[in-house]
Amino acid sequence: MIMNIEKFEEKHLDGVEKIEKTCFAHPWSREDLQNQIGLDTSHFLVATVDGNVAGYMGLQIFGGEGYVTNVAVLPEYRKQGIAESLIREQMKNKMSFITLEVRESNLPAISLYTKCGFKNVGIRPNFYSVPTENAIIMTINNEDI
C-alpha cells in the first residue's frame, strides 16, 4: 500500500464526492466541495492509496483557529492509519487550537481524536439530525499539537 497525502484539487473531486455520499447522512454537495478549492481559509487534504482517493479531511482556519469540517475514509481503507495521517498533517498548520464536533455514538472517531490529543470539552445537544444526536466538542490546543 502506497499512501500519499495531497492538497485537495479538482482532480480529486469525484473521489471526495464518493466518500461524502458513502460516509455521511447529509453529504456535502459537489458544488460545496468544489467551492473549497482555492479558498484561503480552506485547508482540505486528500489521502490516496495506490492512486485512489481513500480519505480526506477538511479544515477551516480563521484568525489562527482551526475548525475541522470533515474527516472521512472509505470503509475498505479504514483501520490503516489514513485518518490519523490526515489529522497529523493538518496539525502542521500554525493554529492556536483545532476544534471539531463528533457524534456521541461515533466511538471509533472519538478514540482516534483522543489518540491524536484532542480533549472532550463539551456537548452540543441535538446537533446532528438523521438520526438526532448530541455532538461531543473536542479541542486540541497549540501547546499539545
Which residue stretches match the model-derived regions?
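Extreme N-terminal starter segment of soluble prokaryotic enzymes
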Residues: 2-5
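Acetyl-CoA-dependent GNAT
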Residues: 7-76, 84-93, 141-145
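Short, P/G- and charge-enriched loop/turn segments at secondary-structure junctions
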Residues: 32, 124-125
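Residue-level detector of high-confidence beta-strand sites
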Residues: 56, 121-123
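Conserved glycine-rich acetyl-CoA-binding loop
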Residues: 70, 74-88, 103-111, 115-116, ...
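Short aromatic/hydrophobic contact patches that present stacked aromatics
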Residues: 70-72, 99-101, 137-139
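Conserved GNAT acetyl-CoA-binding A-motif
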Residues: 93-104
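C-terminal "cap" of GNAT-fold acetyltransferases
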Residues: 103-107, 116, 126-145
